[in-house]
């Protein structure tokens, strides 16, 4: 089933112009993540950020996040792009920013990381979904990769939040849910809107 995307009609000097709501928001330098962090959503977000940087590298990009999380690899690709481009990326949590999405929320420009009052934030260690199968050697390779990814995420959260690495390691062992206020105290965001 396809998703219904509202159309916006605007008056211009040449008459009426219609476009989908997401294209209109992009004109205002708004990028949205709604749903899982996947290869497809990451590709779209990265392309939009690169486009907005090429259009004007001196203006902020406003990145709205409502996501339970998803692929760590794709989340890191978005985060790397946020760090690569010259524009400041302001992050705003609406609804939820879980797992990989909480990393994106925290990766916004310092002083420009926000959450709406009823937002929820979740951090936890990475996992493999879908059932792992294979030979012992292959499972060991996956286990080693997961351990390295966990260490990288712990270090990244520590750097982004200012929390000691030992606290991050402890908190990420299990699902750790936070309200917007708790996320602010933790250093994942700077302000509640």
From Swiss-Prot:
Q: Which CDD domains match?
A: S14_ClpP_2
Q: What is the protein's species of origin?
A: Desulfitobacterium hafniense (strain Y51)
- Top-level EC class as recorded in UniProt: hydrolase
SUPFAM superfamilies with a match to the protein in the record: ClpP/crotonase
Protein name per its UniProtKB record: ATP-dependent Clp protease proteolytic subunit 1
GO cellular component entries? cytoplasm; endopeptidase Clp complex
An example GO biological process term is: protein quality control for misfolded or incompletely synthesized proteins
Q: What InterPro entries does UniProt report for this protein, alphabetically?
A: ClpP, ClpP/crotonase-like_dom_sf, ClpP/TepA, ClpP_His_AS
State where the protein is found: Cytoplasm
Primary localisation category: cytoplasm
* Similarity comment: family membership: Belongs to the peptidase S14 family.
**Function description:** Cleaves peptides in various proteins in a process that requires ATP hydrolysis. Has a chymotrypsin-like activity. Plays a major role in the degradation of misfolded proteins.
- Reactions catalysed, as given in the entry: Hydrolysis of proteins to small peptides in the presence of ATP and magnesium. alpha-casein is the usual test substrate. In the absence of ATP, only oligopeptides shorter than five residues are hydrolyzed (such as succinyl-Leu-Tyr-|-NHMec, and Leu-Tyr-Leu-|-Tyr-Trp, in which cleavage of the -Tyr-|-Leu- and -Tyr-|-Trp bonds also occurs)
Q: Which Pfam families match?
A: CLP_protease (PF00574)
Please describe the quaternary structure of this protein. Answer: Fourteen ClpP subunits assemble into 2 heptameric rings which stack back to back to give a disk-like structure with a central cavity, resembling the structure of eukaryotic proteasomes.
Q: Which UniProt keywords apply?
A: Cytoplasm, Hydrolase, Protease, Serine protease
- Gene encoding this polypeptide? clpP1
Q: Which GO terms describe its molecular function?
A: ATP-dependent peptidase activity; ATPase binding; serine-type endopeptidase activity
> Which EC number applies?
3.4.21.92
Q: Which residues form the signal peptide?
A: none
Where does the source fall among the domains of life? Bacteria
Which residues does the entry assign to the active site, renumbered to this chain? 99 (nucleophile), 124
């Amino acid at each position: 089933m396809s998703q219904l995307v509202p159309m916006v009609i605007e008056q211009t000097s040449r008459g009426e112009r219609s476009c989908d709501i997401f294209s209109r928001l992009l004109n205002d330098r708004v990028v949205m993540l709604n749903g899982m962090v996947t290869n497809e959503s990451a590709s779209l977000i990265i392309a939009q950020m690169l486009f907005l940087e090429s259009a004007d590298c001196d203006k902020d990009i406003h990145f709205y996040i409502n996501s339970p999380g998803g692929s760590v690899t794709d989340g890191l690709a978005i985060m790397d792009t946020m760090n690569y481009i010259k524009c400041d990326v302001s992050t705003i949590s609406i609804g939820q920013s879980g797992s990989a999405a909480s990393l994106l929320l925290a990766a916004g420009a310092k002083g420009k990381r926000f959450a709406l009052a009823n937002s929820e934030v979740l951090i936890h260690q990475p996992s493999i979904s879908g059932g792992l199968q294979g030979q012992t050697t292959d499972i060991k390779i996956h286990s080693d990769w997961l351990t390295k990814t966990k260490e990288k995420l712990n270090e990244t959260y520590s750097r982004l939040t200012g929390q000691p690495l030992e606290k991050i390691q402890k908190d990420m062992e299990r699902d750790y849910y936070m309200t917007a206020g708790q996320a602010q105290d933790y250093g994942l965001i700077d302000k509640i809107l």
